[in-house]
Amino acid sequence: MSNDKHIAPLAVVSMGCVLPGVDHFRALDTIADWETVFQSASPLAWSETSRPIQGRQMDDSGFDFKKFSIPPLFRKAVSRETRLALRAAEDALAGLVLPESLRDCCDQFCAIHLGSDAAYRNATKVGALRALAEKLQAQGCPAAEVRRRLDDYKQPLAESLGCSSHDRVGEMASSIPARIAHFAHTRGKCQTLDGADKGGLRLLQLAQDCFRYHDSQMAVLTSVQCFHHRPQAYMLLEQGVSQDACWLEGAISLVVCPLAVAHEQGWPVLTQLGDIVTTHDGSPQPEADHPAALYFAGANQVFCQIVEMVLRQHQRCEGRSFTGGRWQVNVAQTQSLTPAVDDRVAIVDYQPITGHPLDKTQFWQTLEQGEDALREHSAAHVNAEAFVRTTQQKLSTYIHRTMSFPAHSPSDVALKKPMMPAKKQRLDVTQLYALNSCHSWSEKIRQFERVAIIIASNLSLSADRLQAMRALWSGLPGSEGAIPLPELPSINHWSWYGACGIGTAQLLAQYFGISADCYAVEAACASSLAAVHDAVRALQAGRYDAVIVGGIETATLERDLVLCSAQMMLSVSRIRPFSQGADGFTPGDGGGFVMLTHHPVPRAIATIEAISGSCDSYSMTAPDPLGQALAIKKTLSLTAIDAQTVQYLEAHGTGTELGDRSEVMSLKYSYHRDKHSPLYIGSAKYNFGHCFAGAGALSLCKVLSAFEHERIPPTPVSELNVDLPLGDIPAEVPQQAIPWRLSEDGQRKAAINAFGTGGINYHLVIRQSS
């Protein structure tokens, strides 16, 4: 399948704004109205007198939760970022009537930078409990006494900072577009990205790349930024962000589509956006009629400048990012990318990351033999007196084993390339594993001129959350003596890198010694395939020559165990996808990386044939088989491959009764086949646990390893759930490794599912290279 359609200008058919003093885009009648937004700055509430930061923050205390279908129980769990983004999207969509024919193809893409107030509250609750437990243990208190006093403290802590089963959903960046999709009744693809102050630009480029295909016909692009505390600001100042600019909170939504769609629907076009580009060095300075912006809006920077461009009736806007390089958005299209000759994208190399060493041979042996990485919590990983209880309780966990990395402390991870201690101790452990996993790719990636690095990750890493505790610690409820604040490294140049998902991509680019477009993606447990989707679309459009893409997350941290336990999502023993009595998943640390290119590669491992997605957010937590089936249908519509020739499906397979049933039901709509050629199904989560943002990448690595060994590994759960409608497909779950025979056309073909909270679904079809 080929597509010679070039990237076309975007039609902006509506805008929505929620900024200080501005509740609607229509309130910005003149450029004077815009200038008022940032000219009345004052020192931010948490700013130090010795280092004042001027800005304007948002007050959304009057947010209408009922309008956006948020139950009273969950209201404290919903982040400020989510509330602002919902208001901006509502403003943008208010004047548009979306026909039913566009709802399946209306994407919801968002941009943020660093963490949310919800994430910071959750981290502070867990951090305070661990600190109190360690204090009592150091005083020689018996274990039973420590548990009792911790349990007594959990109630006032929950009353102070909030505590509900929705806490994990509320802190997830991907909940923002999922909630917008729920409000707007759209079912297109869904994700949140972090491109730092180029986040808006990445959203626009993603929309351009997506509109070349019929599975995307319009998009609601929303960028949002809040500034929560002093350590967050100081990390940004260390990166060169101006202390003198007005730091501006808020959210902006742009509704964009191809010009043809705007004309078909009779929508007025506010402006076109043609060239949407970045440059890494040797860039010209802004001309006199385009001076540098007088405000810093974080993830909202590009969209703020586009609003200003429209109000000033200028033909372009531009800026310099604190991450390096310049960006520019032109109304006219003066540049054109050359699309890839073939839509198929080659996989050049891959590297799985699990709780085992970085060894592909051991990875395959674990898969083939049906083994796992299950281990007991260590005292360093989980403070049992603080958190582990025999039954489900508030701010606790009820599981004793996970599939974790051997170490969660950066100091305990040996690097393949030396690093300064002042840098290493400020990075996240996932970043160190990522650097080690891609260590051998330096020469290979340097062969390509235009490169991107896209990381599926939690967008707010542990360092960001731990620094936030400094700001919230004084507000902790009283206890028996002050709770000591955990020691943290002072903030320096490397603190920002270790705090955010985009920092992982930036570190890899520096490690390879290359200039690359970098950003991070979060789409709940579908994050990795969402990142692969972005990479594939960009390669197909001719935007890059190669992309390193993957995902990684430490899903076994104390805060994740506590938050997931509150949702009753975890298995009391171990994950058993599709089994009788499946009771949840086991968290695992890991993920994987792949190197992709659209150029002909003589030794490609496999080719990605098609990828697409959907978001059916009728429920923020319950899976929906029709929404999952829509993602599969859209993917298969982009390839000439007959679904009946796909031999193996790597399932999302979370091992929950509801999730397993929903997934199997979704498969019968597209993968129904002759009873003599069953679809084989498996899940890497049995072997390595659920790696959250890294899950889809690990699934992809499993399929690639199976291609290489020409065998389908087992998911040995022993007793399958007889109530699953496997026979309707028909499908089988191998209990031991079986040969992966060539199909009648001499090929091996597979598909991969990745589903996430909020109804976010992605599906990929892959073929082994000849």
UniProtKB/Swiss-Prot annotation:
Q: What EC numbers are recorded for this enzyme?
A: 2.3.1.-
Which GO biological-process labels does this protein carry? antibiotic biosynthetic process; fatty acid biosynthetic process
Question: Pfam families, per this entry?
Answer: ketoacyl-synt, Ketoacyl-synt_C
The keyword Transferase appears for this protein: yes
Q: Does the keyword Manganese apply?
A: no
Gene3D superfamilies according to UniProt: 3.40.47.10
Q: What class of enzyme is it?
A: transferase
Q: Where is the active site?
A: 525, 652, 690
- The Ketosynthase family 3 (KS3) domain sits at 342-768
Q: What did gene disruption experiments reveal?
A: Cells lacking this gene show a white phenotype and produce 2-methyl-3-n-amyl-pyrrole (MAP).
Record: residues binding substrate: 652, 690
Q: List, alphabetically, the PROSITE patterns matched.
A: KS3_2
Q: Which UniProt keywords apply?
A: Acyltransferase, Antibiotic biosynthesis, Transferase
InterPro entries in the cross-refs: Ketoacyl_synth_C (IPR014031), Ketoacyl_synth_N (IPR014030), PKS_Beta-ketoAc_synthase_dom (IPR020841), PKS_NRPS_Biosynth_Enz (IPR050091), Thiolase-like (IPR016039)
- State the pathway, as annotated in the record: Antibiotic biosynthesis; prodigiosin biosynthesis
GO terms for molecular function, please?
A: fatty acid synthase activity
Q: Which domain of life is it from?
A: Bacteria
> Domain notes, please?
It seems that PigJ is composed by an active ketosynthase (KS) domain and by a chain length factor (CLF) partner domain that potentially decarboxylates the malonyl group of PigH.
What is the purpose of this protein? Involved in the biosynthesis of 4-methoxy-2,2'-bipyrrole-5-carbaldehyde (MBC), one of the terminal products involved in the biosynthesis of the red antibiotic prodigiosin (Pig). Catalyzes the decarboxylation on the malonyl group attached to PigH to yield a C2 carbanion of acetyl-S-PigH. Then, the heterocyclic pyrrole group of PigG moves to the PigJ active site Cys-525 to generate a transient pyrrolyl-S-cysteinyl PigJ intermediate (acyl donor) whose pyrrolyl group is captured by the C2 carbanion of acetyl-S-PigH to yield the pyrrolyl-beta-ketoacyl-S-PigH.
The entry's family comment says: Belongs to the thiolase-like superfamily. Beta-ketoacyl-ACP synthases family.
Please state what the protein is called: Beta-ketoacyl synthase PigJ
Species this chain originates from: Serratia sp. (strain ATCC 39006)
* Lineage, broadest ranks: Bacteria, Pseudomonadati, Pseudomonadota, Gammaproteobacteria, Enterobacterales
